[in-house]
Amino acid sequence: MSKSAKNPFQFLDVPRRVRKQPVAQRLQHHQEIYHGFDADRAADQAGRCIACGNPYCEWKCPVHNYIPDWLKLVAEGRLFEAAELSNQTNSLPEICGRICPQDRLCEGACTLNDGFGAVAIGAVEKYISDTALAQGWRPDVSRVVPTGKRVAVIGAGPAGLACADVLIRNGVQPVVFDRYDEVGGLLMFGIPGFKLDKEVVRLRRQILEEMGVEFRLNTEIGRDLPFEDLLRDYDAVFLGMGTYRFVEGGFPGEQARGVFPALRYLIGNIRHVLGLPDNEENYIDMAGQRVVVLGGGDTAMDCVRTAVRQGAAQVHCVYRRDEENMPGSRAEVVNAKEEGVVFLWNRQPIEIVTDHGAAVGVKAVETELGPPDANGRRRPQPIPESEAVIDADRVIIAFGFRPDPPEWFDTYGIERDANGRTLTGQNGDLRGQTANPKVFSGGDMVRGSDLVVTAVFDGREAAQGILDYLDV
């Protein structure tokens, strides 16, 4: 049925199915676990879309991808047209197709979700870019007329890459600065390879360079290059440095030996797997260890799934709410359970138990969910006399991240809120503009720790603000 007449019952006849490797196989490596679609499977899955009059999937997507339209093109075998359309709204579609929590975004909003299984939108999105790029498709910038304007982009993460993508398509030369030796930010160093193959990130860098984007790596603004130089030499500056400072639990024992922040653990492991130079002490090996990860978001899932691949003796994930109210991707919880992770729901850590300065366990109290908080999520309330200790040799803190803006922000009039988030929109209608009219920002620096796709949206929006500012 792939390229023949539309089957009105295709959503019934073709099941939602995204194949993945058997558990025993995927635990032996740090590579992606999902099998990609070939042309026929992609067309069959895309053909399940029933072309809703009001496409909720499109509106639930933070970048408002033209999902029904490119599903239709894939079903008809028009791959390059689908790639062109996909790249119109999303600067990193092959990445978002892999790591977006589609179950609570586009696929969660799919009309078929309740009774028949949502269209596998993420897998089709991944297929479109992967296959089109492999066949030689590239964004067409041949008709772009250079404006002579130059913009400095600080941070080569998703917000910075998205900003650069929009700018170069409009004739503005972006120069992207990053302190790391590879492009991608947390795409490269914070998200494990079993979710995102790093060659995918490197290919997107290559594409952007072919379009004309310039990268200057191993360069930290404020240390290697003064921010003042950027204000002098460029027509505008975009700040997309992300969030790297971890949120502490505020309970006793966090400074004990054997307790690690999630990002330090993940970055050290990813650099080790990739064979990139690093201090050996930054690599934390969990082989044979009893590991407890505190937190219920996607970063916690990355940590538990990394630990089982390192050969941990046992891995527990402790979260203070129930499974239904956890913030992470449901698919990632399923994967973690399949791989042997034990989840302890409704447990609030209150102390890391130590022996001679080293962690030996986590004391947690059981909770029950009470009234909603300001964000609408039910508050966990401790149950008296329910404390218990979970044995642990290693503890990973994965409570999220917050901005850690550099000191030079104050010097150049870049305002922040009480949580360190960069304030934008102070000067009127220009999207992403800070209190310093020449400086724009977006992504986690503005929102706080959030999704890759929302950072992409912010980077693209700020680029439009910059174009308006430059009168391009």
Describe every region a protein language model picked out.
Residues 35-55, 79-105:
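Immediate flanking context of iron-sulfur cluster ligation sites
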Residues 70, 94-96, 103-154, 170, ...:
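FAD-binding core/adjacent interface of flavoenzyme oxidoreductases
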Residues 220-235, 280, 355-387:
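Conserved beta-strand-loop-beta-strand element in the redox core of flavoprotein oxidoreductases
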Residues 255-288, 372-449:
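FAD-site-proximal beta/loop scaffold in flavoenzymes
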Residues 284-321, 388-394, 401-402, 420, ...:
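Long hydrophobic segments that form regular secondary structure
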Residues 303, 445-472:
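A conserved FAD-binding loop/helix module that cradles the flavin
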